[in-house]
Amino acid sequence: MISTKEKNKIPKDSMTLLPCFYFVELPIVASSIVSLYFLELTDLFKPAKVGFQCYDRTLSMPYVETNEELIPLLMLLSLAFAAPAASIMVAEGMLYCLQSRLWGRAGGPAGAEGSINAGGCNFNSFLRRTVRFVGVHVFGLCATALVTDVIQLATGYHTPFFLTVCKPNYTLLGTSCEVNPYITQDICSGHDIHAILSARKTFPSQHATLSAFAAVYVSMYFNSVISDTTKLLKPILVFAFAIAAGVCGLTQITQYRSHPVDVYAGFLIGAGIAAYLACHAVGNFQAPPAEKPAAPAPAKDALRALTQRGHDSVYQQNKSVSTDELGPPGRLEGAPRPVAREKTSLGSLKRASVDVDLLAPRSPMAKENMVTFSHTLPRASAPSLDDPARRHMTIHVPLDASRSKQLISEWKQKSLEGRGLGLPDDASPGHLRAPAEPMAEEEEEEEDEEEEEEEEEEEDEGPAPPSLYPTVQARPGLGPRVILPPRAGPPPLVHIPEEGAQTGAGLSPKSGAGVRAKWLMMAEKSGAAVANPPRLLQVIAMSKAPGAPGPKAAETASSSSASSDSSQYRSPSDRDSASIVTIDAHAPHHPVVHLSAGGAPWEWKAAGGGAKAEADGGYELGDLARGFRGGAKPPGVSPGSSVSDVDQEEPRFGAVATVNLATGEGLPPLGAADGALGPGSRESTLRRHAGGLGLAEREAEAEAEGYFRKMQARRFPD
């Protein structure tokens, strides 16, 4: 019984099934049958007359009457048609039952075909397959018979019993056979005209062609439909039909109905027709492939396209626009995302552009605090690279005041411990590192040594791997570079000067500690020092200290730093304020400083610093540090100290000013500003407030400037 699921299965509709059957297949088969009638049962078409030899013994074999043959023609047609057709019907019926009960209509060894509605009738798979396979078999039989008859009529070769039924009258020739042995005239005197006509059609043997076609066709059907698990069933059926075909052909030889060559040729013709029809007419008896719906074209991702469009617009912007925010506002409040930077060759270490934007978390009702350092002056040893993707990077920096206190205290303790180690003459400041996880003092010393080794390897191998938090390293002779070590997680980011990288000859790992110790001692002796110079100038001063005063060192200098406090440790008025300081050196000859202050402007030295740097043949970033004038500095402040928190009293939104370091244009009026960390301050936050300049401040600044010049004179005595 057919399951309910299959009964309720909706069949497909076909508009071409019945028209193709009625107007194509049936007319072809009918025309073949009609043609066979005229060729076999009538004398309408006469075979060609071919000459023979006088008294040819190969044509004088005994004649066997048609009714006395072992396999007469009618029996041959019935066997060649009935046996294969019956076998196909039985096999299809069994297959349909097995598919319905065991596998269902969607499975089965021979494939599955669903029902089709055509002309208001439902045709199941059994009916459709049976009609198709049996119909092709009938058409093949007719085609084989037609081909055989046409060849026989065209050739007109004689059968072995031709002279027996012809009974030639040699006296009608007028000459003897000795003179002319080959006879082309019709001198037959026999009374059985039908026998004489049949004796002229022997090549190829009709029994051989029809039997071979039936055997090959049904054997291919068995091989395709019957599974190999049936063991001997399939070989038995195949061999049975092959033997039957062979017997039909051989009987024609034994009864002198055909020559052996006629039988062999008939076998080849019948087998060829069967193989062609089985492969191309019925598709090797397999179910036609189901029509799969065309897969819809993948819809274009609008969000992805919009994101890519935004990235393209940012990366293709003008190189001088370094204060643009590269990340969407919604992503500034989330977890930090990694910055992708592709690894390039050794030339990328000397690239002419580094632009790192450090963005603090967006505060409510205020803009984000951003400090940007940009330097794209061309290098003398390498061409300038204008890849916008390398110029713009956005790093989200979450800060924690408690973590900042701990890191500052650890750094000061290490600086005090390094006082007893001595100060080499060629000592240089260290690099700025962004710690991402708490470490003990012993672990930090080990990491410093490992970082020094890594820096030496990176100079030979290639650029540093990308990461979220940058590391600014001041390398003697090559200028500072930005390294992004792979740090995981969103811990706070505080820039603290540490041990110097051993990048040049004659430098020791302890030189940085000695330099910081001497700075602290000098600051303590100064008494009343300038209060809190900005963190910006500290970074520039440190990056300037180890570099050469020549144009090449000035052109290769670049650094980045940012510090900001968490919004939960600040008052509402402080959280609403914003500050953006940008040093943009995209211009080919003069660097430009963009200043955004919320009411209390930064105070810069007059244009003498820039003019001096220009006169020396290059732009010295250290001049910017020497040109800064700030408020009162408490005791213990050193040029390398971290940034401290002070109260911020600017309006909520500030204006943006542009200062040309080379010409001094656009300099704001002299005022007060603050920056570096004092002993009593522990939070690393960039703050600014107005204040006056005192005599003690200028003396401390003059002493620091003298020390810087003295250090440079010692490093470069020539």
Swiss-Prot record:
Q: Which domain of life is it from?
A: Eukaryota
Q: Which residues carry this modification: Phosphothreonine?
A: 376
Keywords, sorted A to Z: Glycoprotein, Membrane, Phosphoprotein, Transmembrane, Transmembrane helix
Please tell me where this protein is predominantly located. membrane
Q: Where is the composition biased (Acidic residues)?
A: 439-462
Which InterPro entries did the record assign? P_Acid_Pase_2/haloperoxi_sf, P_Acid_Pase_2/haloperoxidase, PA_PP_rel
Listed Low complexity bias regions: 545-571, 664-680
Its membrane topology is listed as:
Multi-pass membrane protein
GO cellular component term of the entry, any: plasma membrane
* Residue stretches spanning the membrane: 18-38, 70-90, 133-153, 207-227, 233-253, 263-283
Q: Which residues form a coiled coil?
A: none
Q: Where is the composition biased (Polar residues)?
A: 314-323
Tagged with keyword Phosphoprotein: yes
Q: List the molecular function annotations (GO) for this entry.
A: phosphatidate phosphatase activity
**Phosphoserine-modified residues are where?**
322, 353, 428, 508, 641
Glycan attachment positions = 169, 318
Task: Output one GO BP term.
Answer: signal transduction
Where is the region Disordered? 313-347, 416-488, 545-577, 664-702
Location(s), subcellular = Membrane
Spell out the family assignment given in the record's similarity comment: Belongs to the PA-phosphatase related phosphoesterase family.
Q: What is this protein called?
A: Phospholipid phosphatase-related protein type 3
